[in-house]
């Protein structure tokens, strides 16, 4: 047989030239054990803390939290029943990223930002890390713009500013969520103006709540036309603990998009007690050492790194803001427990809601003495300052006198007058759910209360008086409301008109 070397070498050259090396290199690990939503994985030596990993063949994702010498502790974002010992785990080489942007407005998403409202995929969004470092000192400025809640007791006595963190704390069933919903609904007239520098986009995050509760809340927002400028993030009680742990950070990242683009956002965390419980569950299952109340040692950092991301940015940094309203549920009014004291120390003030007040029909059940805003009147318009300063003092004196009068048999006229005025002011601060008032209407109502126009009215008629007064103002007194809204203060000529209206209305109401 005739062998031709030249021909063979040509064939070899062609083979070598046409050889195409296609290979995919992926770092993998192996499941050592699985149980209670925790997977122990061998391998993945270069995995990052907080990195997303994927379990091959199941599509299930997890997050690497414990990086130990011989294995990695992974928490699962779902049910791990389909995972078996020996399964392959793949690195994604990315830390948890969530969708942000205006495309989320009006949508309901889960703890990772995936839509769960059945309205198709998200559009007009970009992706950001769920956990980022909070802004430093220099990019911030002090809180100066009011964030109106529409609730008289809060806007007058415990004012909240844009960029502030105000804790809402109280036992279960005291109206904590109602305050959040009212605040979101109260932004409708502001957002209707369409001014991006004034609009306030709202994000509500439900942690560990019933699905039926979240569905009712979404329905309420839709009924009041508030869903169009709101995002609901829901990590319900049936979701895995890592989803409940992550949901507040996801919501915060969504709010930061607005803050960093010179807009204003509000994030309502309902509630951080359940997030702490979910984190405790994960930490104990990962065998991290427990501390007080079995919480891990870094549970303070869990909440501080979240709430520090709320800020009012300086004008050089766009002047945007992110306001935080975290909620903490107490057990039998015990505000000295571990998580309540932690969050009280992190926030810029707190609104205490009391069961006793709630059952006495004083709703919202705000304990005025125990509630405080560390931003104070810097977060109020001048008109509100003109009427609110007096109401604080009168309510404080009323509480003192009411306690004293229980033991005194006969009271002098001045004390009796103070008690009567206080009782009427308490009635005046009552407000039904989902009926927030614009700030100019609040100012007029409180003006009537502090200047003695409500004193002749019987205590049980005060609520009816207020409703009738507001109706009168929206009709005959609309110019007064417009003047207060535009001037942001009660000018002498406006005050003259207001006094005339209140005197005439008082006579008609009492007749």
From Swiss-Prot:
Statement: the UniProt record of this protein carries the keyword S-adenosyl-L-methionine: no
Top-level EC class = translocase
Provide the catalytic activity annotation. ATP + H2O + 4 H(+)(in) = ADP + phosphate + 5 H(+)(out)
InterPro entries, sorted:
ATP_synth_asu-like_sf (IPR023366), ATP_synth_asu_C (IPR000793), ATP_synth_asu_C_sf (IPR038376), ATP_synth_F1_a_nt-bd_dom (IPR033732), ATP_synth_F1_asu (IPR005294), ATPase_a/bsu_AS (IPR020003), ATPase_F1/V1/A1_a/bsu_N (IPR004100), ATPase_F1/V1/A1_a/bsu_N_sf (IPR036121)
Specify the protein's topology with respect to the membrane. Peripheral membrane protein
Gene3D superfamilies, per database record: 2.40.30.20, ATP synthase alpha/beta chain, C-terminal domain, P-loop containing nucleotide triphosphate hydrolases
Keyword Hydrolase among record annotations = no
For this UniProt entry, what's an example GO CC term? proton-transporting ATP synthase complex
User: EC number(s) for this protein?
Assistant: 7.1.2.2
The residues listed in the UniProt record as binding ATP, with positions renumbered to this chain, are 170-177
Q: Where are the residues marked Required for activity as a site?
A: 371
Which Pfam families does this entry report, sorted A to Z?
Answer: ATP-synt_ab, ATP-synt_ab_C, ATP-synt_ab_N
Q: How does it assemble?
A: F-type ATPases have 2 components, CF(1) - the catalytic core - and CF(0) - the membrane proton channel. CF(1) has five subunits: alpha(3), beta(3), gamma(1), delta(1), epsilon(1). CF(0) has three main subunits: a(1), b(2) and c(9-12). The alpha and beta chains form an alternating ring which encloses part of the gamma chain. CF(1) is attached to CF(0) by a central stalk formed by the gamma and epsilon chains, while a peripheral stalk is formed by the delta and b chains.
The record describes the protein's role as: Produces ATP from ADP in the presence of a proton gradient across the membrane. The alpha chain is a regulatory subunit.
Question: Which PANTHER family does the UniProt record give?
Answer: ATP SYNTHASE SUBUNIT ALPHA, MITOCHONDRIAL
**Protein's name in the database:** ATP synthase subunit alpha 1
Q: Which organism is it from?
A: Gluconobacter oxydans (strain 621H) (Gluconobacter suboxydans)
Taxonomic lineage per UniProt?
A: Bacteria, Pseudomonadati, Pseudomonadota, Alphaproteobacteria, Acetobacterales
């Amino acid at each position: 047989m005739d062998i031709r070397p030249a021909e063979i070498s040509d064939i070899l050259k062609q083979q070598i030239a046409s050889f195409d090396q296609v290979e995919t290199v992926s770092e993998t690990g192996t499941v050592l054990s699985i149980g209670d939503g925790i997977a122990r994985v061998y391998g993945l030596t270069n995995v990052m803390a907080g990195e997303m990993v994927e379990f091959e063949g199941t599509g299930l994702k997890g997050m690497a939290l414990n990086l130990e010498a011989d294995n990695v502790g992974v928490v699962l974002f779902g049910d791990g029943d389909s995972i078996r010992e020996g399964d392959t785990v793949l690195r994604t080489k990315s830390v948890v990223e969530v969708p942000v942007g205006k495309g989320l407005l009006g949508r309901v998403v889960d703890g990772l930002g995936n839509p769960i409202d059945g309205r198709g995929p998200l559009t007009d969004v970009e992706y950001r890390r769920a956990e980022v470092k909070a802004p430093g000192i220099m990019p911030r400025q002090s809180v100066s713009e009011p964030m109106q809640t529409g609730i008289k007791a809060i806007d007058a006595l415990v004012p909240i500013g844009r960029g502030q963190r105000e804790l809402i704390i109280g036992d279960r069933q005291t109206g904590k969520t109602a305050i959040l919903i009212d605040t979101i609904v109260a932004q409708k007239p502001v957002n209707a103006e369409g001014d991006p520098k004034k609009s306030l986009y709202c994000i509500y995050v439900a942690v560990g709540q019933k699905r039926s509760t979240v569905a009712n809340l979404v329905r309420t927002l839709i009924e009041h036309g508030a869903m169009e400028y709101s995002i609901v993030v829901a990590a319900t009680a049936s979701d895995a603990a890592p989803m409940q742990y992550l949901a507040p950070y996801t919501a915060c990242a969504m709010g930061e998009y607005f803050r960093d683009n010179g807009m204003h956002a509000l994030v309502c965390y309902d509630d951080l007690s359940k997030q702490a419980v979910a984190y405790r569950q994960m930490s104990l299952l990962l065998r991290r050492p427990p501390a007080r109340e079995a919480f891990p040692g870094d549970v303070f950092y869990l909440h501080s790194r979240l709430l520090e991301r709320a800020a009012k940015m300086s004008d050089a940094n766009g002047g945007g803001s992110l306001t935080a309203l975290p909620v903490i549920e107490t057990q039998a009014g015990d505000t000295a427990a571990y998580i309540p004291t932690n969050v009280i120390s992190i926030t810029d003030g707190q609104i205490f809601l009391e069961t006793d007040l709630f059952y006495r029909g004083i709703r919202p059940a705000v304990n005025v003495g125990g509630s405080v805003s560390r931003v104070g009147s810097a977060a109020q318009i001048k008109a509100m300052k003109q009427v609110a300063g007096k109401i604080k003092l009168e309510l404080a004196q009323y509480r003192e006198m009411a306690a004293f009068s229980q033991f005194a048999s006969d009271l002098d006229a001045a004390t009796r007058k103070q008690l009567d005025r206080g009782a009427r002011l308490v009635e005046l601060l009552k407000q039904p759910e989902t009926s927030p008032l614009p700030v100019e209407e609040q100012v007029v109502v409180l003006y009537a209360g502090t200047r003695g126009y409500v004193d002749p009215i019987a205590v049980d008629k005060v609520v009816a008086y207020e409703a009738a007064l507001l109706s009168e103002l929206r009709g005959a007194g609309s110019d007064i409301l417009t003047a207060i809204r535009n001037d942001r203060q009660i000018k002498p000529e406006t005050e003259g008109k207001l006094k005339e209206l209140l005197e005439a209305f008082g006579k008609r109401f009492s007749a």
